[in-house]
């Protein structure tokens, strides 16, 4: 639904204790211009509900809750800086 593939953070990753690293972005998805390979996703928010992304399993479980057209916010790290991007689910 988001057009991205993720993996668990490497054990030696110091910038965040939990989250996932983006390994691939589908160029045709709504995420394509907002999420980059190498980004770390730590949280996803839908409405007033915020979900912590602990690993790739929790990421997939969270994403499965959304339907096409839902508006969400992705919280993460890029190059050591925090970011928040709004995305409409594909």
Task: Show the residue positions of the predicted features.
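C-terminal recognition in membrane/secretory proteostasis and scaffolding
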Residues: 1-90
């Amino acid at each position: 639904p988001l057009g991205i593939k993720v993996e668990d953070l490497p054990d030696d990753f110091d910038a965040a204790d939990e989250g996932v690293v983006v390994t691939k972005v589908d160029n045709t998805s709504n995420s394509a211009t907002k999420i980059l390979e190498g980004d770390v996703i730590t949280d996803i928010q839908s409405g007033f509900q915020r979900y912590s992304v602990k690993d790739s399993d929790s990421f997939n479980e969270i994403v499965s809750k959304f339907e096409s057209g839902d508006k969400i916010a992705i919280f993460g790290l890029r190059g050591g800086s925090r970011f928040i991007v709004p995305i409409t689910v594909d």
